[in-house]
UniProtKB/Swiss-Prot annotation:
EC code(s) of this entry: 7.1.1.-
A GO cellular-component term linked to this record: plasma membrane
HAMAP family on file: NDH1_NuoC
Protein name per the record: NADH-quinone oxidoreductase subunit C
Organism, as annotated: Nocardia farcinica (strain IFM 10152)
Function: NDH-1 shuttles electrons from NADH, via FMN and iron-sulfur (Fe-S) centers, to quinones in the respiratory chain. The immediate electron acceptor for the enzyme in this species is believed to be a menaquinone. Couples the redox reaction to proton translocation (for every two electrons transferred, four hydrogen ions are translocated across the cytoplasmic membrane), and thus conserves the redox energy in a proton gradient.
Subunit and partners: NDH-1 is composed of 14 different subunits. Subunits NuoB, C, D, E, F, and G constitute the peripheral sector of the complex.
Pfam families reported for this sequence: Complex1_30kDa
Keywords per UniProt: Cell membrane, Membrane, NAD, Quinone, Translocase, Transport
Domain of life (superkingdom): Bacteria
Broad enzyme group: translocase
GO molecular function: NADH dehydrogenase (ubiquinone) activity; NADH:ubiquinone reductase (non-electrogenic) activity; quinone binding
PANTHER family linked: NADH DEHYDROGENASE [UBIQUINONE] IRON-SULFUR PROTEIN 3, MITOCHONDRIAL, NADH DEHYDROGENASE UBIQUINONE IRON-SULFUR PROTEIN 3
Gene expressing this chain: nuoC
Length: 253
């Protein structure tokens, strides 16, 4: 019986101790007053019942997301948020309908945008002269299985070359409806990034011109970077594979 095994009728997880919950270099974990706790992680990768002797098997950490930040946000953050608010109102979109929350965490600004307003917000961030976030640096997929109703997140880092500023736009979708509008028409550089995020997380980017796998084979089952993907992988499926001649291969553009 391992130390983590409940005894008798006690089905509660063990209480975390200082060593088990220590952050980098032994520092205590951050305690953000507005943090949203969406789950608890047990062990290094959430795996139980192994012969782990490293000590990480007893790791117990809350899974948290930064909560919303109240204004003022400081520095140019207020200028960007105020200008975006004005631009949205002028376009007929209420600011509160388009954005779920605004987060300032570790000196960085993140705009949490509802997916149905993602394209509108992105276009305003790109085109408004006072904003001018001309460059999208990519798309990062994240899977939070415990974040009920918003398990799949897509994060877009945006850079303003004109004003030398960097922020993030984040949106989400549920596992049961993993659709997010593509930003290809606003930022063409998201082409392959959205394909990669679809390939590894299963997010369907509506409006993408060619949303196909980019790394895994076309007939691969599942999305390898999701938390529910088997940690040990799956049997190799390349046996008997046939490489089509050039005139039969799939076009990527």
């Amino acid at each position: 019986m391992s130390p983590d095994t409940p005894r008798g009728g006690d089905l509660h997880p063990p209480e975390p101790d200082a060593a088990a919950t220590a952050g980098p270099e032994g520092t205590p974990p951050d305690t953000e007053p507005a943090a949203e706790v969406i789950g608890v992680r047990h062990g290094m990768f959430g795996i139980r019942g192994t012969g782990d002797t490293s000590g990480y098997g007893r790791l117990v950490r809350p899974v948290t997301l930064p909560g919303g930040t109240a204004p003022p946000y400081g520095g140019w953050f207020d200028e960007v948020v105020d200008r975006l608010r004005t631009a949205l109102e002028n376009s007929g979109t209420p600011f509160g309908s388009a954005l779920e929350k605004i987060v300032v965490f570790r000196g960085e600004l993140t705009l949490h945008v509802r997916r149905e307003h993602l394209v509108t917000v992105a276009r305003l961030l790109r085109d408004d002269p006072a904003l001018r976030f001309e460059l999208c640096l990519g798309v990062n997929g994240v899977h939070y299985p415990d974040d009920a109703g918003r398990e799949l997140h897509a994060v877009y880092p945006l850079r303003s070359i004109t004003h030398n500023r960097l922020l993030r736009v984040e949106t989400c979708a549920p596992d049961t409806d993993p659709h997010i509008p593509s930003l290809f028409e606003v930022y063409p550089t998201t082409d392959w990034h959205e394909r990669e995020t679809y390939d590894f997380f299963g997010i369907l980017f509506d409006g993408h011109p060619s949303l196909t796998r980019i790394t895994m084979p076309d007939d691969w089952r599942g999305h390898p970077q999701r938390k529910d993907y088997p940690l040990g992988g799956i049997p190799v499926e390349y046996k008997g594979a046939r490489i089509p001649p050039p005139d039969e291969r799939r076009a990527y553009s």
